[in-house]
Amino acid sequence: MALPTQQADELRLYQQTLLQDGLKDMLDHDNFIDCVLKIQGKEFPCHRLVLAACSPYFRAMFLSNLEEGKKKEIDLEDVDPDVMGKILHYIYTSEIEITEKNVQDIFSVANMFQIPSIFTVCVSFLQKKLCLSNCLAIFRLGLLLDCPRLAVSARDFVCDRFHLIARDEEFYDLSPDELIAVISSDSLNIEKEEEVFEVVLKWALKEKEKRAKALPIIFESIRFRLIPQDYIKNKVEKHELVKSDKELLKKLQMVKDAQEGKLPAAVKKTPSKASEGKDGEGVVNGDLEEEEEALPGILNDTLRFGMFLKDMIFMISDTGAVAYDPSANECFFASLSAQIPKNHVSLATKENQLFVAGGLYYNEENKDDPLSSYFLQFDHLDSDWLGMPPVPSARCLFGLGESDNSIYLIGGKELKEGEQTLDTVLCYDRPSFKWGESDPLPYQVYGHTVVSHDNLVYVLGGKGNEKKCLKRVCVYNPKKFEWKDLAPMKTARSLFGSTVHKGKILIAAGVTDTGLTNTIEAYDVKTNKWEEFTEFPQERSSLSLVSMNGTLYAIGGFATTENESGEFVPTELNDIWRFNEEEKKWEGILREIRYASGATFVAARLNILRLTKM
């Protein structure tokens, strides 16, 4: 009767430990030593049986009739004695210290002597250490040592972050084969195929005479059928390295013909002789292999991974982040948001980076000023929130804006005793990941909104020290380091929605000194004038406005409704409205949407392949 799996595993582990401990004890006491490895003057006594059991390299040596395999002392060349010492220690103990400094040497020696267990440990270590600065080196190492697992992991890392890595000069040191291995991948995270062409030509121009010869082969990995015809005509065919190469022009003509529907006859791919059966027929896993029909590589029109981006309304709350696609009326689960504070402000930058700030963060290490606010960034690759340097000043009811590489956190109320209204402006520098102070606002304000347009930051409305709603509008020019007053709003308000829509700044609903309002105003940045806009159907506070693909949406907020007792109380609404530009009216498209409660809303471009449809 067979033993249960768990018990059998326990017995196996016990026996392995007993055997390994016994072998190590014999090594320590020089018992049954029948082999000495000599490396650069250092000697390593060991057992032939142990080496043969762990390494096919040594097994083949000892079982051969070669003179070297019969010697007790074996000289090894091109090996570092310290590295070999670590490997022998691992063989006898299963213990090895791998660091960023020694991993490549250990990896190479393990590969040389065919020790799969150490090889696997090194691969796992390098996979965990993959980063922007080493991914290309690890990719090349994986190819050099013929390790597909490592090479593919590093290549996928490069493909995911292609925009960033293609900026690094090291990328342009890749060999033609290495470059092809990257750009031929379906997982390339790019929106437009033109980016691949531009990177390839930049690579070729680095060593023009030498690399131009490789372009006909490399062009097979560029998916020209995904590139607009005008771009091919005006950019590709007119490039200095292309227009003088007849072979490249011939390939491009094939692409243009294909774009017009004139595809060449597909070539039948026959199985190789290695996979043929007795009668010459292709056999795969016992089944007959059908002949495949394939077009030339340059006519490949399979979409890249990064081409599955969609514009969505991104809803961020303390329970989860959900993406809503209004065009298809579909919701996608994006991320759990356990780190997101309830009272937060969100921001989507021009580069599609998503940030959240707010809440209360207590730092025990900072004895003088332990209170700060959370600051998080959404990681599109892992669909998770990354903790960024916290906001130095804990505050609420502030606004977020952006210009170039800076994020501005403006005004608000201090989360300390007294709840002082602030005029201070904090500036987060994205390249250096550091907070600093910027020019203060000319007045103290909270409950306002902030929008960004053409690298200018606008502050609108809110309440001042006297708790009265403001009409005031200011704009900050980061290049001139100055604030400037603009034409005031028609209605003083706070806690309202705002967005930039078709070049104009819109503000909607909110709280006035006499109650809620449903009025909407539009500010023309060119004329510095406000004009009335179609009213929202209901008076609300904290209504969110989102402009996406030329369409204006209004989401959620709080309205005053009558409860069962006849009392009028603020009620949160989770509906979505769309503005009909032709008929100039608001149309409800969803009565209630999940996860909208307590959420903030931004327009974001998200890859639907990374999301889970709800």
Curated annotation (Swiss-Prot):
Spell out the protein name for this chain: Kelch-like protein 40
Q: What does this protein do?
A: Substrate-specific adapter of a BCR (BTB-CUL3-RBX1) E3 ubiquitin ligase complex that acts as a key regulator of skeletal muscle development.
Compartments annotated for it: namely: Cytoplasm; Cytoplasm, Myofibril, Sarcomere, A band; Cytoplasm, Myofibril, Sarcomere, I band
Question: What does the UniProt keyword field contain?
Answer: Cytoplasm, Developmental protein, Kelch repeat, Repeat, Ubl conjugation pathway
Q: Does the keyword Repeat apply?
A: yes
The BACK domain, residue ranges: 135-237
What quaternary arrangement does the UniProt entry report? Component of the BCR(KLHL40) E3 ubiquitin ligase complex.
Kelch repeat intervals: 353-405, 406-455, 456-503, 505-550, 552-606
